Amino acid sequence: MQLQPAGTGSMASAVAAALVSWGFLDYKTEKYVMTRNCWVGISQRLLQLGVVVYVIGWALLAKKGYQEWDMDPQISVITKLKGVSVTQVKELEKRLWDVADFVRPSQGENVFFLVTNFLVTPAQVQGRCPEHPSVPLANCWADEDCPEGEMGTYSHGIKTGQCVAFNGTHRTCEIWSWCPVESSAVPRKPLLAQAKNFTLFIKNTVTFNKFNFSRTNALDTWDNTYFKYCLYDSLSSPYCPVFRIGDLVAMTGGDFEDLALLGGAVGINIHWDCNLDTKGSDCSPQYSFQLQERGYNFRTANYWWAASGVESRSLLKLYGIRFDILVTGQAGKFALIPTAITVGTGAAWLGMVTFLCDLLLLYVDREAGFYWRTKYEEARAPKATTNSA
């Protein structure tokens, strides 16, 4: 007969009693109780209806939760401007402007500049000449007003220390600069006003690599003359990406004459929203136009060496319209994984509805105590009894 260490049985009993008191050895199973509670029942059905409408109407249909998406397409943009204009100014006499003159840069890109007005200062050479009176701190009465070597922020050159006559009414500081200095008198009307009748051709191609799908905004046609005569119209010619400049500016809410005088910036947005479940038939560009800012100009010069061996230049201050083309896009196609995720999310929300209704029934309802006792009860198996002989 083996002897057990003292206290082993009592320790095991104590551990078992503790586990029972903590409920560690209890097993819980669900109990379904049919309750005749109208307001909780109505709340449950309304919440379930809301979940079903959200999942089917919004998540699946409106947001296309059954589709896999590609929101980073490869983008290609090619632009071409067509038109000819003639200007008649004293400094340049009669001059013809074509695409090579009024478009910067000459290669079509998604950002380009169309010249609509200009200010020319011909035959400049480096030397001494009076500063323009419109420049701050340029006007003077004596040489003391023109410190030698001083160069202002808006000055055209470096002061020589002399105060000289600019014309019959103004005296200004003499400067070392490209002479004569540029005038600040902008033409009252845009010199290239014919630019409003120029046409802009935008060819945009988007490629969604995830779906091996590509689409262009230009009509696929064998007629080589089609794009020479068509103009864009959202209803009659949606696949003719040829825009008249005047119409394009008008679609931004601006006026071409005002914008052409001192320049500005126009944004052209092209957005692709493609549903590839329809084999690409529901994939067309949407255009929008914004006037981004008013006032845009920059300077450029043509240099040459005169017969006397002196370097000369003609300075052009160009005003015009800067066009910024921004292309965005997304494409969706049916896939099992996003569909399963959307449906699974809806099922989880339906489970949350049951949980919320239980809270209403067991904690908020006036008969919460009764429902609590009915739903939760403790079940013990009857103890077996033995009769002694």
From Swiss-Prot:
The chain crosses the membrane at residues 42-62, 336-356. The gene is P2rx6. GO terms for molecular function: ATP binding; extracellularly ATP-gated monoatomic cation channel activity; protein-containing complex binding; purinergic nucleotide receptor activity. Residues 63-335 are extracellular. InterPro entries: P2X6_purnocptor (IPR003049), P2X_extracellular_dom_sf (IPR027309), P2X_purnocptor (IPR001429), P2X_RECEPTOR_CS (IPR053792). Monomer. Unlike P2RXs, P2RX6 does not seem to form homotrimers. Forms heterotrimer with P2RX2. Forms heterotrimer with P2RX4; functional differences between homomeric P2RX4 and P2RX4/6 heterotrimer are minor. Forms a P2RX2/P2RX4/P2RX6 heterotrimer. Interacts with SF3A1; resulting in a reduction of the splicing activity. Changing S13K: Promotes the formation of homotrimers. It holds the Pfam family P2X_receptor. Acts as a modulatory subunit rather than a functional channel. Unlike other P2XRs members, P2RX6 does not seem to form functional homotrimers. P2RX6 requires the presence of P2RX4 or P2RX2 to become functional at the cell surface. P2RX6 can be translocated to the nucleus and functions as a nuclear regulator of post-transcriptional modifications in neurons. It is found in: Cell membrane; Endoplasmic reticulum; Nucleus; Nucleus inner membrane. It catalyses: Ca(2+)(in) = Ca(2+)(out). It comes from the Eukaryota. GO terms for biological process: calcium ion transmembrane transport; response to ATP. It is a multi-pass membrane protein. Disulfide bonds join C129-C179, C140-C163, C146-C173, C230-C240, C274-C283. Keywords: Cell membrane, Disulfide bond, Endoplasmic reticulum, Glycoprotein, Ion channel, Ion transport, Ligand-gated ion channel, Membrane, Nucleus, Phosphoprotein, Receptor, Transmembrane, Transmembrane helix, Transport. Belongs to the P2X receptor family. Residues 1-41, 357-389 are cytoplasmic. An uncharged region within the N terminus of the P2RX6 subunit inhibits its assembly and exit from the endoplasmic reticulum. The P2RX6 subunit lacks nine residues in the left flipper, a flexible loop structure, which is a key element in the activation of P2RXs. This is P2X purinoceptor 6. One of its GO terms (cellular component) is parallel fiber to Purkinje cell synapse. The modification Phosphotyrosine is found at Y66. N-glycosylated. N-linked glycosylation can affect trafficking to the membrane and function. Glycans are attached at N167, N197, N212.
